[in-house]
Amino acid sequence: MKSFLKMTLAVIAGLILTGILFFVIMLSVISGIAAAGNKPAEIAEKSVLVLKTGTAIPDRTNSNPLSMLDPFSLTFTPEAGLNDILKNLRKAASDEKISGILIENGLMPSGWATADELRIALKEFKQSGKFIYSYSDYVLMQESYFVSTAADAIWLNPTSMFDFKGLAAEVTFYKDALEKLGVEVQVIRHGKFKGAVEPYILDKLSDENRLQISKYVGSIWEYAVKAISESRGVSVERVMQLADSLSGYNAALLTGAGLIDGTIYRDQLEDSIRSAAGIEEGKKINFVSMTKYSKVPEKHSGGLAKSKIAVIYAEGSIVMGEGDETNIGGNSYASVLREVRRDTAIKAVVFRVNSRGGDAIASDMIWREVELTSKVKPVVVSMGNYAASGGYYISAAADKILASPMTVTGSIGVFGLIPNAQTLLDKKLGISSDVVKTNSHSDFPSIMRPLTAFEKEVLQSNVERTYSTFTGVVAAGRGMSQANVDSLGQGHVWSGTDAADAGLVDSFGGLNDAIKEAASLAKLETYRLVERPAAVDIYSRLLKEMSGEVREKIVSRELGEAARYYYDLKEIISSRGVQAVMPCYIDIY
């Protein structure tokens, strides 16, 4: 018995020591990678910069090493954000060591507005006289193709396909599933177009929601088709005809029509690159990733300039509290804006917003700080793929708002959502509860019972008051009457093109254009950029986020496409109170 206990304790001690050792090793490896990432890099002559499209490209490069870790293979796959990609394209244009760019097309969407910014930046790079080639090993997606129309040549692998068919917007509905589970979603809303709640109370699109989706998806596709037509020298009518006929499954037809330049194997692609770059036949090509090129120092970067422009990145859902790198915390972003406002060296602010919205109170907190900041120094909003509902709310007080024609914005409307899981818990799972109250509504709101008529009335009043505040904020920021904003509001979602026509956006442009606009408003000839929120200390971040980052990767890996449904249903449970969110999970593909 004694020997058994000794052996058991030894095994337990061994497991604990192994776990500690593994943690220390992982911490050392990750810290080493993070430290190495700060060292300047050098590249060889006649290098080719690689731009990977068809991947999830965040607005800002994630400085968290855990985001680069694949928990299954324990390998690191660093990826650059849009901010660094745009810097790299500008830098590469004048870098004598960069001969050209290869666009490697993948399968994941990064967002149409992001694609538009990349395409514009590539066209500017092209003015340097250097080559741009585009290649797809597998399936060329429409979004990647749109970016690739800035290239000198677009090639496909002979066995690959081009998924060219026009845009579709798909909405997933949970009403019947929730009813079967015994969950009632109680909704209080303002705005006939507020489609964010429809997946929980309907089993198909309302006429109003179908109308608005058709309009903004049609606007985005119209812009894309026009750009394709101009770049490839193919009429708009012919482009539409090719999309209608699913011609992407016949590469020869696409080549003949002029949408692509042909099909070649990778060795033939590399021969073409060698020829364009002046590299000897058979010699290895030095391909440079965006992540590596970000570490190459830029000449004349303005690093010594005293005046600064702060670029604040706000990406994800708007939530109460501090938030994290995947969302926008009301408290933390209010603090960032206060800090930027008080810093006298910062002469202007670019507020990059890429959000479908979120908590109404958190949105109002951020808006207030933007308004106060705009009274002290110029604030320019740069809208990404989305700046809708709460995303528009936090943008409204800026001096200027820039967006892509492909940005999805507007959705000026609010709603309240309270799940009632009484049937699920009581009838299906046998879980009941009892409550002792000091007042009539001490347990309000509760997922254990339905709302009373009075409680619904209180929530409706709160929603109406919040909507009035929202339209007032927009009216003040955009110089409109509140009645005019109401006519544009009601939860209506707009494309960037239509938002500009409606006066919700000042002009078209991406992040680079917003920075130039901010410099112009602040009358700055020389300046340097500082990015906010500031990077968190690596050790604090590792300890705080290790479990969360790995958990999210495991969920995404195991559920794949279905992971979005998991997060959507999870949000139902967490979303209490008044929300300002656009229709959720509308896939445009």
Enumerate the language-model features and the residues they cover.
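N-terminal type II signal-anchor transmembrane helix
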Residues: 2-42, 46
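Cleft-lining beta-strand/loop regions that shape enzyme active-site pockets
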Residues: 40, 49-171, 301-424
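Extracellular/periplasmic catalytic domains that process cell-envelope and extracellular macromolecules
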Residues: 42-45, 300-306, 427, 523, ...
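Charged, glycine-interspersed solvent-exposed loop segments at helix/strand-loop junctions
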Residues: 175-274, 422-502, 506-507, 512-517, ...
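C-terminal long alpha-helix characteristic of the crotonase
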Residues: 230-231, 261-305, 415, 471-477, ...
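Active-site proximal loops enriched in glycine and acidic residues that flank catalytic Cys/His/Asp
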Residues: 313-316, 353-355, 383-385, 398, ...
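Short glycine/threonine-rich loop-to-helix capping motif typified by GTGT followed
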Residues: 360-365, 498-501, 543-545
